[in-house]
């Protein structure tokens, strides 16, 4: 009687069938792939924003230092090209309590793709290898076509045009004409 009873009992409906397990696995995989895609997209976008921000900050630093130096410089402001490298030299006032004049220079190296800057109380010696010890303002700098990075604007200023690489996105462009606001002349040369 006991053996007969176990044979007649209905099979248990507990647990999952193989098809239910396959469907659940496929749904879980689909959700996981979607979430992974969103995370990868967000990471890529964040990386792009970071490189553009870094390039923008470097270019703005170059423009700020040029503007601060050249807008108060005594004329003449000298813009020179040596091969594909270019540099600006200007006689600038000190920021101290008494007015003294010093020299500032900005150097674009096409080989290193950098813009560097230095200041001195006396004249500045310009050489392609010597400028590597100067303060680095920006790297990844390129000319815009055949337009020089630094070009003279008479004897009282400079036209500055360049791009800064921003990783895999479009380079960030900068262009400005900076002229001296100082009436000072004849305060020596650099």
Predicted region positions:
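Aliphatic-rich helix starts adjacent to a transmembrane/signal segment
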Residues: 2-71
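Short linear sequence signals and composition-biased patches located at protein termini or domain-edge surfaces
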Residues: 3, 142-190
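Residue-level signal for beta-strand positions within conserved beta-sheet cores that form or flank
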Residues: 14, 102, 174
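Short, cationic motifs built from Arg/Lys/His that form the positively charged side of catalytic pockets
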Residues: 60, 71, 105, 117-118, ...
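Surface-exposed patches in mature extracellular/periplasmic domains of secreted proteins
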Residues: 78-80
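Type IV pilin-like appendage domain
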Residues: 82-153
């Amino acid at each position: 009687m006991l053996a007969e009873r176990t044979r007649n009992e209905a099979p248990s409906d507990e647990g999952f069938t193989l098809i239910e397990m396959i469907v659940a696995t496929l749904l879980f995989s689909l959700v996981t792939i979607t979430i992974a895609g969103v995370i990868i997209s967000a990471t890529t976008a964040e990386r792009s924003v970071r490189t553009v921000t870094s390039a923008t900050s470097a270019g703005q630093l170059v423009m700020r230092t040029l503007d601060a130096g050249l807008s108060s410089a005594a004329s003449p402001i000298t813009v020179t090209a040596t091969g594909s490298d270019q540099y600006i030299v200007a006689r600038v006032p000190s920021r101290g309590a008494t007015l003294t004049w010093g020299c500032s220079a900005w150097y674009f190296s096409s080989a290193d793709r950098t813009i560097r800057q230095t200041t001195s109380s006396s004249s500045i010696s310009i050489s392609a290898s010597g400028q590597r010890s100067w303060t680095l303002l920006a790297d990844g700098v390129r000319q815009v076509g055949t337009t020089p990075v630094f070009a003279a604007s008479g004897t009282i200023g400079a036209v500055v045009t360049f791009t800064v690489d921003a990783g895999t996105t479009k380079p960030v462009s900068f262009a400005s004409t900076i002229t001296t606001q100082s009436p000072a002349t004849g305060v020596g040369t650099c």
